[in-house]
């Protein structure tokens, strides 16, 4: 254990979270990530459980968690269909 005046031991770059990584350490941090299919699946699974426990699985729940999912769906679907919608808007006769 560190005494009162000493700094704690530095955390290795691999064990840091994304928000704790400095800009100079970012390329090495990205290269240390697991990009295998199981690693990517695990990252999505951790994100899902984190979102679910923060917004859906709460004592006093509200509609905010589901509303965020629906808002993201609407924004992504609009961004994917924007190219098609833009061409329809520029037509003179429909």
Curated annotation (Swiss-Prot):
Cellular component aspect of the GO annotation: mitochondrial inner membrane; mitochondrion; nuclear membrane; proton-transporting ATP synthase complex
Stretches that traverse the bilayer: 68-85
Annotated keywords: Acetylation, ATP synthesis, CF(0), Hydrogen ion transport, Ion transport, Membrane, Mitochondrion, Mitochondrion inner membrane, Phosphoprotein, Transmembrane, Transmembrane helix, Transport
N-acetylalanine found at: 2
Keyword Ribosomal protein belongs to the record: no
Coiled coil: none
Database matches in InterPro entries: F1F0-ATPsyn_F_prd
Residues with PTM Phosphoserine: 3
Primary location recorded for the protein, binned into one broad class: mitochondrion
Family that this chain belongs to: Belongs to the ATPase F chain family.
Subunit-level organization: Component of the ATP synthase complex composed at least of ATP5F1A/subunit alpha, ATP5F1B/subunit beta, ATP5MC1/subunit c (homooctomer), MT-ATP6/subunit a, MT-ATP8/subunit 8, ATP5ME/subunit e, ATP5MF/subunit f, ATP5MG/subunit g, ATP5MK/subunit k, ATP5MJ/subunit j, ATP5F1C/subunit gamma, ATP5F1D/subunit delta, ATP5F1E/subunit epsilon, ATP5PF/subunit F6, ATP5PB/subunit b, ATP5PD/subunit d, ATP5PO/subunit OSCP.
Full protein name: ATP synthase F(0) complex subunit f, mitochondrial
Species the sequence originates in: Homo sapiens (Human)
